[in-house]
Swiss-Prot record:
Species per Swiss-Prot/TrEMBL record: Drosophila melanogaster
Biased composition (Polar residues): 575-605, 832-847
Stated role: Required in photoreceptor transmitter synthesis. Catlayzes the conversion of L-histidine to histamine.
Biased amino acid composition, Acidic residues: 606-616
Protein name listed in UniProt: Histidine decarboxylase
Taxon lineage: Eukaryota, Metazoa, Ecdysozoa, Arthropoda, Hexapoda
Length: 847
């Protein structure tokens, strides 16, 4: 092939590559071939004479592509990303054409010089201390591009071994290196990558694995205990590997604690951030990097997530002389006149020759810039969050580990066999590709955002495939995953979890429950929209709306989980006021399909039946003097008296839907509650002082529903944000005040919070604005303001009392309700939030 033909074939190859990447979504992700398939397609010996290029290239599609696992496919979710980009491909095209071997500065000065600059750029981008950078010719630290993170780990372990042997000789002269090496011990988490174990095998040193905590992280305490125990046995601890972003679950070792322990015992601390290191270019993810100042080395792979194709691993060391001592060999033919002054990277690695990798990294950094790469990282995290929400919305699945960055691990509840069968079936179908992992004995599926082409539509499509195959597998195995859970079991999993998840109070039920709880019923279909968004194409019966309506109209008190599934139910005995409590099937317990179907049909029938309470309530709705459907609101009967120690009352506020028939006007959707003041160290109005908000979460603090009561608008807010803004936000289920339980004084430390209910504020406002209110109403309002228990008010009179007030509160032209009645300042501050509300709501609906 001459230059003329090369130009032609080169253009054809560029077109082929562009077409391949542009249309990769159409290809099957995982190949449908068997081992040895290619032997039948190719001859046993190489051709004697050369073949024309068209014939060679035609065999790419015929022979090679059928056996390719398409790592750039948006439906590829196995392993960690192995991304590429056009600037990266162009960089290696040029580097391969130049084909220089930059083992010394003299062998190719530009190769070495550009690598030094690129490594400084990358180090500054992820926030490394200056001690790790090439800042001057006298600088001891610096960075180098290695082939893989495995090689980087081995280099650092061997360097740490050399330093440890030298120090041992200084303290105890007379020992042979082999004798000292036999005593050396290295440490890592039991979640560390297999390359750490392989490095220890090559280095002929012992590797001790530290058990990870419940968050799958290695902590300083257990590491210190292991080190001290080994010292007592005459061993020599010398090296620790901390992992930031484990392969199994993307968990993070506590680098700060580990660094302190390593400093105490003078151990080499290596940080393996192969995947997560790319995310550190975003400042919000650098919290995991705290303690890096105590590390001796750190490595991550730009070839994983920074749009640079394989191979490219960035390694920084604090003391390059320790690496030089380990790999320093200088035969005469490798020496040059600048030896000792210029950087010779052959002393920083195991092989001698090295590729011009810095060129493609340089092309990518200049083409995308820091902001462009940050957008890419954040988009991957956003898509992983979307997938996490989809998994959480299906009760058959669970997340055995917290999601970090772009990796989600999930499994079907129950035996490992079910999840294993699901994964095998998914990979056999070939429409998406995932791999398994084992987390503390649980078989899990890893789902990683691995492609620059992945969109939300791809994520939804893959999730629908997973759900469909899961349904088939469960049906074949005659297994039904129960979505009900013993409250006792929930409390055992979380000691801080209270005695109830969520209290649902029927508007007509006079029963007494814990006075610290309140229920808000919202008929604006907010939760229905949210629920539909995260449970795409949800087809299970009974429907969410029917189930919640049936619960509320049944006259029973229920505890519910975050998916509105029954946990414990308490039924009032109308005869003597006693309660009866019954529990349901155990969490994750499997039942036969026939039994589950029978229970489901019974639940549907119960929900469809119109109870006497519902009939009476609908009758009141039709006969009461309620305004037009566009503005209709009503307030239910308050519950009977609670204990005097509680200053909050239970009320049910029902807002009718402006577009619904009378039957649906009392369709409660959002349920919220407030903890008693004994559970609070401070009022939790503090995080959002100018908003009336409610939060609904599950016992594991998974994603929540946050409602902002500004003119009927709603928005979502992550639980993490709330937890970070309030020190008293813990694992309690409802930790923010609702409009019907608000502070009564200016002081945020008011010990009597919450003291007033929504109806109390309504009555106070009515008293101040209406001269027509009789003495009885004034007396009742005064009694309520003092925190005393109100006399039960008949539905008709209460409806006549509050309807005009509800209409005025709902009107955008009216001031917002505050803890002291009406506050103009709150309404003005609330207007700024409205924009956020609209924006967030639109984003939520787009899901």
């Amino acid at each position: 092939m001459d230059f003329k033909e090369y130009r032609q074939r080169g253009k054809e190859m560029v077109d082929y590559i562009a077409d391949y990447l542009e249309n990769i979504r159409e290809r099957r992700v995982f190949p449908d071939v068997s081992p040895g398939y290619m032997r039948q397609l190719l001859p046993e010996s190489a051709p004697i004479e050369g073949e024309p290029w068209p014939k060679i290239f035609s065999d790419v599609e015929r022979i090679v592509m059928p056996g390719i696992t398409h790592w750039q496919s948006p439906h590829m979710h196995a392993y960690f990303p192995a991304l590429n980009s056009m600037p990266s491909l162009l960089g290696d095209m040029l580097a391969d054409a130049i084909n220089c071997l930059g083992f010394t500065w003299a062998s190719s000065p530009a190769c070495t010089e550009l690598e030094i600059i690129v490594m400084n750029w990358l180090g500054k981008m992820i926030g490394l201390p200056d001690a790790f950078l090439h800042l001057s010719s006298q600088s001891q630290g610096g960075g180098v591009l290695q082939t893989t993170a495995s090689e980087a780990t081995l280099v650092c372990l061997l360097a740490g071994r050399t330093r440890a042997i030298q120090r041992f000789h200084e303290r105890h002269p007379g020992y042979q290196d082999a004798e000292i090496n036999a005593r050396l011990v290295a440490y890592c988490s039991d979640q560390a990558h297999s390359s750490v174990e392989k490095a220890a095998l090559i280095g002929l040193v012992r590797m001790r694995y530290i058990e990870a905590d419940d968050d799958l992280a290695m902590r300083g305490k257990l590491l210190r205990e292991a080190i001290e125990d080994d010292i007592k046995q005459g061993l020599v601890p010398f090296w620790v590997c901390a992992t930031l972003g484990t392969t199994g679950s993307c968990s993070f070792d506590n680098l700060e604690e580990i660094g302190i322990v390593c400093a105490e015992h003078h151990l080499w601390l290596h940080v393996d951030a192969a995947y997560a290191g790319s995310a550190f270019i975003c400042p919000e993810f650098r919290t995991w990097l705290r303690g890096i100042e105590r590390a001796d080395s750190i490595a991550f792979n730009p070839s994983k997530w920074l749009m640079v194709h394989f191979d490219a691993t960035a390694l920084w060391v604090r003391d390059s002389t320790a690496v030089h001592r380990t790999f320093n060999v200088e035969p005469l033919y490798l020496q040059h006149e600048n030896s000792g002054v210029a950087v010779d990277f052959m002393h920083w690695q195991i092989p001698l020759s090295r590729r011009f990798r810095a060129l493609k990294v340089w092309f990518v950094l200049r083409s995308y810039g820091i902001k462009g790469l940050q957008r890419h990282i954040r988009e991957g995290v956003r898509l992983a969050q979307k997938f996490e929400a989809l998994v959480l919305a299906d009760h058959r699945f669970e997340l055995p580990a917290k999601r970090h960055l772009g990796l989600v691990v999930f499994r079907i509840r129950g035996d490992n066999e079910i999840t294993e069968k699901l994964l095998k079936r998914l990979n056999h179908r070939g429409n998406l590709h995932c791999i398994p992992s084992s987390l503390k004995g649980q078989y899990v599926i890893r789902f990683t955002i691995t492609s620059t082409h992945t969109t939300l539509d791809d994520i939804v499509k893959d999730w629908m495939e997973i759900r469909q195959v899961a349904s088939t597998v469960l049906e074949e195995m005659n297994i039904t995953i129960s979505n009900r859970v013993y409250l006792k079991e929930t409390k055992e999993k979380n000691e801080a979890f209270g005695s109830s998840l969520l209290l649902s109070n029927s508007p007509l039920s006079p029963k007494v429950v814990n006075g610290s709880f309140a229920a808000i019923f919202d008929a604006d279909e907010f939760l229905a929209k949210t629920y539909a968004g995260v449970r795409i194409a949800h087809q299970e019966s009974p429907s969410m709306r029917r189930r919640v309506r049936g619960i509320l109209m049944s006259g029973k008190q229920f505890s519910l989980d975050s998916h509105m599934d029954v946990v414990v139910q308490t039924t009032l005995d109308a005869g003597n006021g006693a309660t009866r409590t019954s529990t349901t099937n155990s969490y994750g317990h499997t039942t036969s399909a026939a039994q589950a179907n029978s229970e489901r049909q019974a639940s549907i029938q119960e929900d469809n039946e119109e109870s006497p309470e519902e009939t009476e309530l609908l009758s009141l709705c039709r006969t009461s003097n309620v305004p037009s459907p566009e503005h209709a609101h009503s307030l239910s009967t308050p519950s009977r008296s609670c204990s005097s120690s509680s200053h909050s009352l239970i009320h049910s506020l029902t807002q009718s839907s402006p577009r619904s028939s009378p039957v649906n006007q009392f369709r409660p959707i959002t349920l919220c509650a407030v903890p008693s003041q004994s559970q609070l160290s401070m009022p939790l109005a503090m995080p959002l002082p100018n908003r009336n908000v409610t939060v609904s979460v599950d016992s594991l603090l998974n994603p929540v529903t946050t409602c902002n009561v500004y003119h009927g608008k709603r928005f979502l807010e992550p639980l993490e944000n709330l937890a970070q803004t309030s020190a008293s936000f813990s694992s309690s289920i409802f930790r923010l005040p609702t409009p019907i339980a608000t502070p009564t004084r200016e002081s945020p430390e008011d010990p009597d919070w919450p003291a007033k209910t929504f109806s109390q504020l309504l009555l106070e406002r009515y008293s101040s604005q209406s001269q027509s209110l009789g003495n009885n109403s004034s007396t009742e309002s005064s009694s309520l303001s003092g925190g005393a228990t109100p006399t039960p008010t008949p539905m008709s009179s209460l409806d006549e009392l509050v309807t005009p007030l509800l209409l005025s509160f709902a009107s955008p032209s009216q001031p917002m309700l505050s803890a002291h009645g009406i506050g103009e300042g709150q309404r003005e501050q609330g207007s700024d939030s409205d924009a956020t509300v609209c924006s967030t709501t639109s984003s939520m609906e787009s899901l």
